[in-house]
Amino acid sequence: GYHDWQYPKEEIDKLRDPSVKAVCVINPSNPPSYELAPSVLDQLVDVVKKDNPEMMVITDDVYGTFIKGFRSLMYVLPYNTICLYSFSKYFGATGWRLAAMALPEKNIFDDKIQRLPEAEKADLHRRYSSVVLDPDKMKFIDRLVADSRLVALNHTAGLSTPQQIQMSLFAGFGQIGRASCRE
């Protein structure tokens, strides 16, 4: 039969259950690059707003740059969503594992950390006290960066590999306006 690469309504409705804590969505799909239909995005918004406002959404938007007018879950559900993006597809650097993560200033991840039991907050305080002066106010995204640096330091430090330098150039390119490219 015909495959439209959309999540069936009954599958999305399963996310209404508050015991579902997180969902990971690949949008556009990998590898055919079909984006979620507006009706599917609307249903996901409805699920979060009406039935499961505590659900964390992880969206992988790697193929988003190939879709004209692409709308990310980060756009329609910013508070609940963390967005993953890879430079590798757009710039043809597959296999290099060059990626970025985005999170809005006000987000569910920071709020969930603030609502943790005191014992868990104390563990986090100890874990990040060597990184910042006030670990209790440390943002979730900064915790991810700190943790990823620990991993990176076990491999290589700084901008020492071609991939790390290339990722910096890709990120810089994304900041250049279209008018600047024509000059």
Outline where the language-model segments fall.
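PLP-dependent class I/II
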Residues: 1-182
